[in-house]
């Protein structure tokens, strides 16, 4: 049962503001709604009386962890403190808006954001994941943009765990079912398996939108007399207390059973029509301000619009179109029914606004207006059930300085190095290691999942599966495009949260750079355990500082993000998992750099960057010994900037025909993936004196495998030398070969590599 459903459904007396003022001692179930004693006292102090049942519901959802960021807000300010004026120069909208917006030149702007829908996706995987996609798409719509692509970051329990099949199957079908129905290409992401995510899967959805700069819209209610119009789907009982309450608590031993009513139900076809309706409304200049209805529903939309504006607001709640009978005011206000938007419209444009909605068969209703006061007042059949200062609901909720303490176990964890593990030496052992990693759920092909998504709908996808970053064309006439990548490593972040966040940033940045695009902006989704655990808060604060400092070093701003706490069951938290998304810009997608080898005959393979003996937290340690300990790889952000600059120049000058970043599985995995993507073999010749195991499997950061046309090798090598970037020749592409050969050690046919990689997920989930 949803917590909000515990508020009285039918009473002999409607709990109006007048009634609340005359019944100060009436008991209220604030604790069941997630409010602490001190929070309830503060609400009474703000109002000068006890809240009505409807006000109590409104404050409870808006002051929840998910909506208020009450445990993280004090730390998230560090992003602003480390963002320079130069970094802000290209930002048209940033933290605090529905999504960040970046100027990418030629009058174009891009908006992108990643958000979590973790808890609902465990309770009801299909709808949880589907509505996660729908929610982030509406955030992008609310900025005035056309959504053009989605990505996803997924974390599940061990592949062989009994419940993983249920969760993965529903989540993947939900993402594909909703995104495919919207006609949005899914251009990339990650899927990770680890026992810590059993019972607490992570479903982080990213959406990218494109707009002309003059079409930017923001969430505010301004101008007394302007009308508030609710449009989209009808309001029902689904999702009441969904992300706002469900996502602000941990699961207990009962797991998901008691939480089913809190999951929203999505209709992608309604959302598809809503997208086109919104774009026509924007084009007609009919919208002053707009807000999507997601977590906390109308409670959020009305209070945030009023709080961000220059006046107050009145709402006639009984005007809201319903799809369930006998809903209470609290339920109407807090419903998280999907596919709804709330707009501020000039009275002179109301008829035109409603006409556009009728054209698209979108239900639209005037439910209120902006006032010249400073209160949000909501009535129910003529009686006032809410009378509050909107800022106290939307932006002035509680802010906690939670206790922060480095875990007592951290020193022992860092001292437990992987150097003690037995390493492969012979050619046969190295070959077996390669196949063991490739044949594990951690590094195997994700085609079983990605083939359920449409990657090329709309015809603007330039890079998707196999590529490190997804790429889209946004301007047909000039070829201007964007590249996006998302990355995270909970294992590295557990070992060192500061460095782990920077490694996620560095990999996402590098994944964009290897496409030939220039990284320009960052978004994030910070997934952690309970903020009431001082050890979790230490992980969180360190990760925030690492990410903020890293962005400052790279000179690219954080444009927005999301925090997801309480990802744990009982006292068992997930690995700290900061997901980082990086946006890049390329002036002409025709100069993109693909992943696959063999575009040019006789390409030279070169390794850029330094390889160190770094195996702590690696996939090799995980697969061969189930080991997690030590220190993560060194991160050098100055080197990452240098790599990006070299790759951009090489792309522009035609010096590189393929590129692939090195991360999990090291050089060996990158070679295999590039060879399979290009369906061509290669011969690897390790540099003299190199340790084969270290060179092939180390996960040192700041490295890229590139294929260079034979005629451009000396020119490319000269560019790297001039800029101080290590570049080592490690082999050649052999289009006449059907194998990956490491000279003097081993060879594996492409057929065996492909079969090993592609058999894994169907074996578990097919």
Curated annotation (Swiss-Prot):
> Any idea which positions bind substrate?
116-119, 138, 264, 336-338, 564
Q: Where in the cell is it found?
A: Cytoplasm
Look up the record and name the pathway of this protein. Purine metabolism; IMP biosynthesis via de novo pathway; 5-amino-1-(5-phospho-D-ribosyl)imidazole from N(2)-formyl-N(1)-(5-phospho-D-ribosyl)glycinamide: step 1/2
Q: What GO MF terms are annotated?
A: ATP binding; magnesium ion binding; phosphoribosylformylglycinamidine synthase activity
Quote any Pfam family the record assigns.
FGAR-AT_linker
- Would you say which domain of life the source belongs to? Bacteria
- GO CC entries: cytoplasm
> EC number(s) in its UniProt entry?
6.3.5.3
The residues the record assigns to binding Mg(2+) 1 are 115, 562
Primary place of residence? cytoplasm
- Tagged with keyword Amino-acid biosynthesis: no
GO BP terms in the entry: 'de novo' IMP biosynthetic process
For this chain, the family text in UniProt reads: Belongs to the FGAMS family.
Q: Which NCBIfam families match?
A: FGAM_synth_II, PRK01213.1
What is this protein's name?
Phosphoribosylformylglycinamidine synthase subunit PurL
Give the gene symbol. Answer: purL
